[in-house]
């Protein structure tokens, strides 16, 4: 199996995406030779991309890229290398060449790239939920937890103030080392990122906090945008937030707090996202990537880029087709 290099702009990043990538790197190291490489600027104790390119055989390594805004430049920079794009958020607007396989971090992203890169090799690999996110079955002294970062104005400026007059509400406004401990103290977790992602024209890449909260026993109220729809099922394992009116949300949240019950001991809502399950998928994917790059080296007859009109503007054709279809259908009814 080829050596694998996970590319990072830098290593000192406090974000969920960076943490998810680090967890995946650790998992890959159980399967194949894998290490982190930085490409922004040199950092002590870490390989730098330009040095790695000079020291490695082009065919005996795989470079995994993921930082959305840097992807087009990195693909050009690694033109003669085996490159894989690990895609979380979508909507950046770039095309991925058919020579670059795509690993989608959610089923929402999988569907996006299956439409916009129909000739590419595509896999699905969910982000990892750490074992620390589990229900400890302890008394809960916080009614509601909210993470300020990426939250909608409605959540922070209307809903939270209305709830604070009746319930104990913790608003997390900085990086937390032990988020699982907080989730294990809370009955309800509120999450609404639809406004945040919409303003940038991007999608929620994986949205792990609601699933982490569920794994710790919280009742979740959330937006269901993008990758959140992978695992959130309103009315069955969560409640949709920002529904109809402020008063409706308040009523639903109040009912959840007063009716909160300890979840089943046997059920783990994050079972498919645990390290063991993700590792099994990763083993299959890495084997498939190795085979793909072996074949690519021997077979230069790749599909030509798909017509952009076909990929990105299918609705225009439908609009032209529908009126004619119904006109002919009505004529046939009259004739009958």
Where are these regions (language model features)?
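Nucleotide-sugar-dependent
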Residues: 193-207, 225, 229-230
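A short, well-ordered alpha-helix in the C-terminal region of glycosyltransferases
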Residues: 259-276
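Acidic donor-binding loop of glycosyltransferase active sites
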Residues: 184-200, 218
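Catalytic core of nucleotide-activated saccharide and alditol-phosphate transferases
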Residues: 67-160, 300-301
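N-terminal pre-catalytic "stem/leader" segment of glycosyltransferase-like enzymes
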Residues: 1-67, 218-228, 234-251, 262, ...
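Conserved active-site histidine-acidic residue motif and adjacent donor-binding/catalytic loop
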Residues: 170-185, 196
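Short alpha-helical segment that forms part of, or immediately flanks, the ligand-binding pocket
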Residues: 180, 208-215, 229-230
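Structural alpha-helical scaffold elements that stabilize or flank donor/cofactor-binding regions
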Residues: 55-57, 95-96, 181-182
């Amino acid at each position: 199996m080829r050596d694998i290099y996970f590319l990072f702009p830098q290593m000192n990043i406090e974000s969920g995406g960076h943490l998810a990538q680090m967890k995946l790197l650790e998992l890959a190291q159980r399967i194949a030779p894998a290490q982190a490489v930085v490409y922004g600027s040199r950092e002590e104790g870490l390989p730098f991309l330009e040095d790695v390119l000079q020291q490695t055989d082009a065919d005996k390594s795989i470079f995994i890229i993921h930082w959305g805004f840097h992807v087009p430049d990195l693909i050009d920079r690694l033109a003669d290398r085996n490159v894989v794009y690990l895609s979380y958020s979508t909507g950046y607007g770039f095309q991925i060449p058919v020579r670059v396989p795509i690993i989608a971090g959610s089923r929402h992203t999988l569907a996006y790239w299956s439409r916009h890169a129909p000739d590419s090799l595509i896999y699905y690999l969910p982000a990892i939920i750490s074992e620390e996110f589990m229900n400890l079955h302890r008394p809960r002294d916080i009614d509601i937890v909210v993470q300020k970062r990426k939250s909608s104005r409605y959540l922070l400026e209307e809903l939270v103030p209305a709830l604070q007059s009746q319930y104990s509400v913790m608003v997390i406004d900085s990086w937390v080392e032990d988020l699982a401990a907080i989730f294990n103290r809370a009955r309800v977790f509120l999450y609404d990122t639809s406004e945040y992602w919409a303003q940038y024209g991007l999608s929620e890449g994986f949205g792990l906090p609601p699933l982490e909260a569920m794994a710790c026993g919280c009742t979740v109220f959330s937006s269901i945008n993008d990758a959140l729809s992978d695992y959130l099922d309103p009315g069955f394992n969560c409640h949709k937030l920002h529904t109809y009116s402020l008063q409706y949300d308040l009523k639903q949240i109040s009912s959840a707090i007063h009716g909160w019950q300890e979840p089943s001991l046997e059920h783990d809502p994050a079972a498919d996202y645990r390290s063991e399950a993700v590792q099994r998928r990763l083993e299959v994917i890495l084997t498939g990537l190795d085979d793909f790059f072996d074949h690519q080296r021997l077979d230069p007859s790749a599909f030509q880029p798909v017509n952009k009109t076909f990929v990105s503007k299918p609705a225009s054709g439908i609009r032209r087709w529908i009126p004619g279809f119904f006109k002919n259908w009505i004529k046939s009814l009259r004739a009958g």
